[in-house]
């Protein structure tokens, strides 16, 4: 390292060569030759797909800064767990009929290797959305089904309802993502024999069924007389227990914690009626739900007992919901917990035999703006540097003479100050309030602060730009470059040896 060749008239200043940026760059280049590239088919005994729902690039950057600041650092230099993975790339997320996508079409692409329409789960693009008849004979095989068919162990975890679009695309075929329980089915769907998503989960009969299923959404499995949504009188949790007599059905974090990973057979955990709590809400209000890290850790312990290996899909489903509600605090704290869960998986597995992929299904219209000084609180108001490059003492004022935050949204419900309320969904109870507000006396770092937005909409929208993908283990290098989202399936299938010869 160090100085250029003898015949050069350039000489490096010692400060340049001893700088941590310079040393760090040299170290990365030097380490590259140790990096394993494994092209061999079937080299990954285990495959774990982590999906941060709505975790676009700006979300990753802001979550990285927040996580670093929570540890007392400036934040910008921090790395989330998955950012240390050796390979990364970009993913094009559009659906076959939609420029900015939804979670049903995107997760179908990742799980089945082909893009499809927005709102459609596990069904080819030739089907019409919400038309049962048009979807028949157009079901797509998923990576989870292939793994089950090979005798591998399988798991699906989500902080959203387990019947929600992302987890559903691992096991269900439905031309309408909203058919989560039979109350949502149209007359046409019933007449043509389409089954609701919860029913498909419980009656999943490939291999010995999905081994570990954890998430929210209990209401879609229970009849109305038991507080559920079903109108057919069926209790699908009872049906699951009958089908898996040695299985364990759990409904609380305490019951889940009591499970013995070394001996438990199959597990169905439905921890909430609808979505599970946001992570900050779960912690602040001591809710009896497992964290995503706890669910991930124990699932790997259970699934790794199978000598044939396993396929596991882990969704942080509520990064997306925080953004839809215009709550950066909630989206980012869920993203930090997602990073913690990925760290747990990295610690419990080896890059020799386990492919871990981390990605998002789509982005959100969430921006990191202004010229804040280094280490400025990411949830705070912009404080810029003065003409000598030193931080000012007060927040900057915009041309309207009011301060402004670093983080904001292009559209959505807009500003609200709900103080210490940790449930971002409380925002939906109040009217939209878009445009500029005087934030001088507002604590923008509080859990209940919802950022300003420009275009008034009942919910903030997804965004259409590419999302990141990060990977470690056999086949990870195949995700470098800018690729279609459907490639994710092909990498998992190749590295995991999931496709028959």
Which residues make up each language-model segment?
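Short glycine- and acidic-rich boundary segments immediately preceding or forming the N-terminal edge
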Residues: 1-41, 149
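Glycine-rich phosphate/pyrophosphate-binding loops
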Residues: 139, 144-145, 149-169
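A post-motif C-terminal structural segment
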Residues: 15-26, 40-45, 55-61, 65-108, ...
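Structural beta-sheet core signal
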Residues: 49-50, 156, 358
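Alpha-helix C-terminal capping segments
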Residues: 111-113, 145-151, 348
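Intrinsically disordered, low-complexity repeat regions that act as multivalent interaction hubs
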Residues: 116-119
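Marks the mature luminal ectodomains of secretory-pathway proteins
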Residues: 135, 149, 496-497, 501
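His/Cys-centered metal/cofactor-coordination and adjacent catalytic loops
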Residues: 122-137
